[in-house]
Curated annotation (Swiss-Prot):
Cofactor: Zn(2+)
Signal sequence bounds: none
Described function: Part of an energy-coupled inorganic carbon pump.
Claim: Metal-binding is one of the keywords in the record: yes
GO cellular component, one term: plasma membrane
Name of the protein described by the UniProt record: Probable inorganic carbon transporter subunit DabA
Positions with a binding annotation for Zn(2+): C326, D328, H480, C495
Gene Ontology molecular function, alphabetical: zinc ion binding
Record has Aminoacyl-tRNA synthetase as a keyword: no
Organism: Dinoroseobacter shibae (strain DSM 16493 / NCIMB 14021 / DFL 12)
Family listed: Belongs to the inorganic carbon transporter (TC 9.A.2) DabA family.
Protein keywords: Cell inner membrane, Cell membrane, Membrane, Metal-binding, Transport, Zinc
Bilayer topology term: Peripheral membrane protein
Amino acid sequence: MTHTATLISVDTLTAAQAGAVQAIPPAFPLSATVAVNPFLGQAGHSLPDTAAVLGKTAGCATTAPRSWFAAEIAAGRITKPAVAEALAAAGLDWPVDKVISAASRQRPAPQALPTVADLAGASEAPGWPAQAEARIAAWVAGHFDQGQALWAAGAPSGTYADWLAFATTDMTPDLAGLPGFRAWLKALPSDPTEALLAAVNTLGLTEAALPLYFHRLAMSLGGWAQAARYRLWQAELAGQTDTTLAELIVIRAVWDAGTLATRPALAAQWDTARAAFAAPVTPSEDDLIDAVLQDAAERSTQADLAQAFAPVAKAEARPALQAAFCIDVRSEVIRRALETCDPGIETLGFAGFFGLTAAHTPTGSCNSEARLPVLLTAGVTSKASGDHDAARITTRVTRAWGRFRQAAVSSFAFVEAAGPFYAGKLVRDTLGLGKADAIPGKPVFDPPLPEEAQIDAAATILNAMSLKSNFAPLVVIAGHGSHVNNNAHASALQCGACGGYGGDVNARLLADLLNQPHVRAGLAARGIAVPEDTIFVAALHDTAQDAITLYADDLSEAHRAAATASLAQARQWCAEAGRLARSERQPSLPGATERDGIAARAQSWAETRPEWGLAGCKAFVVAPRTQTAPAQLDGRVFLHSYDWAQDEGFGVLELILTAPVVVASWISLQYYGSVVAPEVFGGGSKQVHNVTGGMGVLDGGTGALRIGLPIQSVHDGGSFVHDPLRLTIVVNAPQEAITDILARHDGVRALFDNGWLKLLRLEADGTISERYTGDLTWEAFAPGTEAAQAA
């Protein structure tokens, strides 16, 4: 096979390839799943621009169906004034009624530009696109395997090289009606960049067509592209690089080129498609209308949210109990419930890793868990107390037994011989009566932190929590986790700020740190006087069962004795708060008929909806708790405690806006994407999932890796339970401080400037005073005023 010279330079080619790689978000493995913004690669673009691009590269919507907007308008939840405001913000001189009437008409579904495989499927070989997907998936599943496969693939020599070795011996394409495909592949260069040049030349692509075409190829790979992007994400955190996704794009381009080379009858159709890839991409009128409707829905929600805030109130008396929870929206319900138990209870909200970026090694493990936000790298290491050697032996025996049960030959004998002995376990698991997990050993820093570093960490964390005075006798540091059964996506219900693990380790490390006498002395020298009778105790909030477990055994004997009465009272309050929270949540859980049956329900191995996770999230409030305490926010708002008057230099505010807010945006937009485009950004149905490679799930036995939230996480069987709204950030801080932070952080500013996050400013008197409009500018927040006149 010969190739004519290409006019496209290697630099141009690799730049377009790198752009396509950056357009794809990472997908984290099932063992530590965290929410990822599916529009991460489009953060620098507006919603209508993104709709235009993803319409051509993925054939997906980027907003809810028009029918959803029409229903919201009919119910009065989207108002005409809000539509008028959204039109003005978009710079569109359209009548409001044009947008309102458009909501009642469903727009044509976006159609992705066709690849050569698509053209072959439409004209000559109907099953060819699925065949291409299946053959690439069959290879890539083994290539990406993280230890699940019993017959592992050989040592990798490079993504493209490994695939080429597989593909040139795979006879499936020939049998599927593409004779000569393998022969064409065998003539390809062994270097991936040279192979990509050869493919581009065969396809006749121009420089203008490359960015959109490569993006289209990456999107056609589904979750496999995101799994590959994860490898690059991890490498970049370590200051390195990874070419897996870039080489997957080579593989997909080669597949197209080979199809065209062996089916020349497709040339005329491909000429038309190739021209479309090279054409400028601009939003259509439908894209603009959808963006206006989306903005109007969010403005209407903000108008309602503005009624929820109260003036700042200063606490006079010493609290009876303080409890710091994760900012997770699920904490809002139990925090509110706990506060009703006694007027002396005060709760706080803080990112659930509690300021400790810990790489933690559980008992018996050789691998560490990154219990920290995925935006950060580990700063400390820790391990669980206990006999690690004995635990490792137990772990290895358990793993070996599991391998025996699953092996190709022994699995049949195992089922025949040992199956009846598992009957009792099957019954217990079906009824949700399995044994509770044992509490892991107390975590300790390993190696120990130097004393000065301990004091630095304690002071930084308490300052960031706005907790520097008026300490209660007992302060609970409550991480959160979710104990569920038979759930491949269990880690997605854990703490996102802890990298998809529970927050118990971080909470226990911090509580122990704050109880150390030398740390207390060091804090006092820095102006943070913790009373001698104040004791910190860690806890775990189980979000599936709304139960709070105090880790009192972590305390020293002296502290346990001193806090006996406080601990007993705290347990009573926590139990009552759990009962109230379960009572509030029960009506929203399908099939949950008894308030106290939620715990057993969460442990049922047949339950596809053990809890709703963060479904419904709509806002993130950065303010003193007293401003939100009177409101019932229905578990839909992230609550981060913050007092700007204590934040000299606004370093804490900068940390909040650049870390927890960004993580929350990933969470919100993952739910958003899983609702508006479940076929592309959703995780499919749990009822047909098969775990593959330990990193993701397939619908059935092959095909694209499903990334995002399963339909059961956002849909109750009758309707969606998550409103597709972009997150509104409400901040009580001076405008100048917020603007200055945005000016210094381009990535965060892009989220606000392009509308992926909304920003409002809250005053001390409980009123929303300003709305951020982009480009470091603000406007007065007066929902409906000017718009009503325009309407």
